[in-house]
C-alpha cells in the first residue's frame, strides 16, 4: 500500500504510517493546492527509506487554491527533484492537461511517472503513454457518467495500467458517496476487467506487476 503526501504535515504522516507497518510505503510531495507553501518545505523528508516517490504534485486549475504561476513553479521543481533523486513522480492534474504536458516536455519526463487518479479520455491517455508514463485509474472509472475515462481504460496497455482508490475520496460504485477505503481497490480492478472482457484475476496480476515497475522501491 502506498500512502501519499500532499504537503509537509501529510507527508510526515505518510512517513510515520509507512515506518510503523510492513508493506506500506510513503510518497512526499506538494499538491498544487499547497504550492504556495514552497517545495523547500518538503525537501528534507526524502531521506527516509520508506519514501519511494515524489508527489503528489502537478496542476489543479479547477479549484485554483494556489496561484497558477506558483503551481507551475512547484510542479517543475518537483519534476527536477524526481530526476535528481531518481524517484518516481506522482502527478495530479485537473483541468490543466495542456499545461501539465508542456511542463513535462520542458523539464523532461522522469522514467517512472504516474498519472494518479487519471480523469482524461483516449486522447489524454495516448499522450501519457507517449511519455512512457503509467496511468492509474480510481473509483471514478466505475461512475456511469465516466464514459471517456472508461474508453481510456479499455485502450491503456496492461503493463502501464494501475488501479487505486484515492482514499478517503471517490469511493467506487456501489459505495459512491461513502468514505473510501483501500480495501475497495478490487472493485476498481473488477470493473476494468469487465470493461475489457478479461478476468478480474488477470487485472490483479497485471496491476501488481505494473505497480512494481512503476515504483521500484516496493519491488520484492
Regions found by a protein language model. Give the residues of each.
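Mid-domain alpha/beta scaffold segments of enzyme catalytic cores
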Residues: 1-220
Amino acid at each position: 500500500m502506498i500512502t501519499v503526501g500532499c504537503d509537509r504535515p501529510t507527508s510526515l504522516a505518510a512517513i510515520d504510517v509507512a515506518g510503523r507497518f510492513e508493506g506500506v510505503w510513503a510518497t512526499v510531495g506538494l499538491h498544487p493546492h499547497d504550492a504556495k507553501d514552497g517545495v523547500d518545505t518538503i525537501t528534507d523528508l526524502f531521506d527516509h527509506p520508506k519514501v519511494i516517490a515524489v508527489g503528489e504534485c502537478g496542476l489543479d486549475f479547477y479549484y485554483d487554491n494556489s496561484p497558477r504561476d506558483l503551481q507551475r513553479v512547484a510542479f517543475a521543481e518537483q519534476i527536477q527533484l524526481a530526476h535528481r533523486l531518481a524517484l518516481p513522480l506522482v502527478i495530479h492534474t485537473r483541468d490543466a492537461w495542456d499545461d501539465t504536458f508542456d511542463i513535462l516536455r520542458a523539464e523532461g519526463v522522469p522514467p517512472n511517472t504516474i498519472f494518479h487518479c487519471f480523469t482524461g479520455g483516449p486522447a489524454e491517455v495516448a499522450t501519457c503513454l507517449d511519455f512512457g508514463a503509467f496511468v492509474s485509474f480510481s473509483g471514478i472509472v466505475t461512475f456511469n457518467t465516466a464514459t471517456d475515462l472508461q474508453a481510456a481504460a479499455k485502450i491503456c496497455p496492461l503493463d502501464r495500467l494501475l488501479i487505486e482508490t484515492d482514499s478517503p475520496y471517490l469511493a467506487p460504485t456501489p459505495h459512491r458517496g461513502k468514505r473510501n477505503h483501500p480495501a475497495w481497490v478490487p472493485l476498481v480492478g473488477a470493473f476494468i476487467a469487465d470493461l475489457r472482457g478479461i478476468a478480474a484475476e488477470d487485472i490483479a496480476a497485471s496491476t501488481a506487476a505494473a505497480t512494481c515497475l512503476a515504483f521500484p522501491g516496493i519491488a520484492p
